Swiss-Prot record:
Keywords, in A-Z order: Disulfide bond, Glycoprotein, Secreted, Signal
InterPro entries attached to this UniProt entry: LY6_UPA_recep-like (IPR016054), LY6G5B (IPR038773)
Highest taxon above the source species: Eukaryota
The protein's name: Lymphocyte antigen 6 complex locus protein G5b
Signal peptide: 1-18
Biological classification of the source: Eukaryota, Metazoa, Chordata, Craniata, Vertebrata
UniProt gene name: Ly6g5b
Native source organism of the sequence: Rattus norvegicus (Rat)
Glycosylation sites: N182
Compartments where found: Secreted
S-S pairs: C28-C55, C31-C40, C47-C73, C81-C98, C99-C104
PTM comment text: N-glycosylated.
Chief place where the protein resides: secreted
Length: 194
């Protein structure tokens, strides 16, 4: 009997000593505007948070149709995971999914596909160009965050920012949604880079 207890204790000690150290930060995918069919339109990045906080996928619906996804770093409010909640407009609402390991909020589709499956009109649009992505972040006035893009002057004219018509929201409405998600304790907005 004592030998059996000793074996169990030694086994437990062996497992405890053999565990890998837990990282102090978690890395998540970051995308502010993802079409469910074609992937991240707004430029894909990554974000880091404390290891006690989750990676998030926030799905924005209009009535029962998925309009877009937001992927990013969540704040430590795990009770909010799997929550459904109405935003600003009676026909828009969100659903939150959380996960607790690096890059667990993976993409729902291949990124930046050149051909779109399904009939035209079912997608938000093609990925934005680098200058459009820069304009997108500037127009949102998010906390001075700019994605890792090659430095160049943002051009006006044919390459200027036009949100995908299938989205059905303005830049101002998107900004309200992102700030709401941040202030409600769901999404951590990236900070300015030095």
């Amino acid at each position: 009997m004592r030998a059996c207890v000793l074996v169990h204790v030694l086994t437990m000690v062996g497992f405890a000593l053999g565990k890998a150290p837990v990282a102090s930060v978690r890395t998540c995918h970051l995308c502010f505007l993802e079409d469910p069919s074609i992937g991240c339109i707004s430029g894909s990045e990554k974000c880091t948070i404390s290891s006690s906080s989750p990676c998030m996928v926030i799905t924005i619906y209009q009535n029962v149709k998925v309009r877009f996804h937001v992927r990013g770093c969540g704040q430590h409010h795990s009770f909010r995971c799997q929550e459904n909640h109405v935003i600003y407009y009676s026909d828009y609402w969100y659903r939150v999914n959380c996960c607790q390991y690096d890059y667990c909020n993976s993409w729902s589709s291949a990124q930046h596909q050149s051909t779109l499956p399904g009939p035209p009109g079912n997608h938000l649009g093609v990925p934005l160009s680098e200058s459009q992505i820069k304009q997108f972040y500037q127009a949102l006035h998010l906390p001075l965050f700019q994605p890792d893009l090659h430095t160049h002057k943002v051009s006006e004219g044919p390459d200027s920012l036009i949100l995908p018509p299938g989205l059905g929201l303005s830049i101002a409405d998107l900004r309200k949604i992102y700030l709401f998600l941040n202030s409600s304790g769901l999404l951590v907005l990236p900070q300015a880079r030095p």
